[in-house]
Amino acid sequence: MSKASKNTSHRKLFTVGGDAPFQFVEAYKSLRTNLEFLSSAGNCKTILITSSVPEEGKTNVAVNLAMTIAASGKRVVLVDCDLRKATISRYLRIPRSHAGLTNVITSKDEGALATALVRVKDSGITVLTAGTIPPNPTELLSAPMTEKIFASLQKAFDYVIVDTPPVSLVTDAAVL
């Protein structure tokens, strides 16, 4: 598993730590508490974050939620499934060339997952970036290997937070 450092120029986007406004932090803590209550039966390990249209802040919510849950001591992986406009690697300063979800899917080797995961320094989260942007995102996300990857992540982590494209534009989120 690789390590990435947090980028201070993007900290304003992801502000659950440091000098974030109290109300902002408390809103995410409240969301975390409600999700933990819902998942107390152990059946809510994967949380998919989407929006209806672009620029509504779904990636912001996904990253802040992942960091807030991780701050409570849970093992959290954030998966960038927005294979059309992947931004998590850029925001968290993970090299774009680093292998990600699409690379693991196309390799058809579950062992490739371990090398694709990146632990983000000082955040408590692990990230699976989108990887190489494919010409056929919906078909790739529909592949049987995708289901195996998510099953592996659900076994290894307490929570799997998934950032997807807006639902009104493409069917990628519905496939997941």
Describe these PLM feature segments.
Residues M1-L176:
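P-loop NTP-binding module
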